[in-house]
A protein has these predicted regions:
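An N-terminal, well-structured beta->alpha segment
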Residues: 1-36
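Glycine-rich phosphate-binding loops that contact phosphosugars or nucleotide phosphates
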Residues: 39-46, 50-157
Length: 157
């Protein structure tokens, strides 16, 4: 049991280290976009990405950056009215193909909000339709059962 716990932690650490070379000009551009945002930082994502999004929004708010989480399914049904052209939207999707997230993209474009994608697939539809893409993909999840998105959610944080 201890060995399995150590292996899991090592896999998580390795996944984070995979990101180091990807802290590049895209990362700098995303930070600049957020710092220059005259509105709020809106985070969206489904499932586990949504849980990470809620945590990110809370962290932004704690550090003085106006932020909130927008559930994309609720966005489809009217909550996009909370988003303005002054906002930056960060959309999280490991696959970059999450239907609910992709469904709100045309409306976000019409509103005029800027869009940062955090994806595990830099060639995905979400990545291709964003202003800035951050590739946070991992080569392996740390879940010993192969069921839970462990390393990918840690990388997104």
């Amino acid at each position: 049991m201890l060995e399995q716990a150590r292996n899991t932690l090592q896999m998580e650490a390795d996944a984070i280290l995979e990101l180091v070379p990807r802290v590049d000009e895209h990362f700098s551009a995303a930070v600049a976009m957020i710092l220059d945002c005259p509105g709020r930082v809106v985070i969206t994502g489904m499932g586990k990405s949504g849980i990470i999004g809620r945590k990110m929004a809370a962290t932004f708010a704690s550090t003085g950056t106006p932020s909130f989480y927008l559930h994309p399914a609720e966005g489809i049904h009217g909550d996009l009215g909370m988003v303005t052209e002054s906002d930056v939207v960060i959309a999280l999707s490991n696959s970059g193909e999450t239907g609910e997230v992709l469904h709100i993209l045309p409306s976000l474009r019409r509103i005029g909000a800027k869009l940062i994608a955090m994806v595990g697939n830099a060639e995905s539809s979400l990545a291709k339709n964003s202003d800035i893409t951050l590739d946070v993909g991992v080569s392996q999840e740390a879940c010993p059962l192969g069921l839970a998105p462990t390393s990918s959610t840690t990388a997104a944080l």
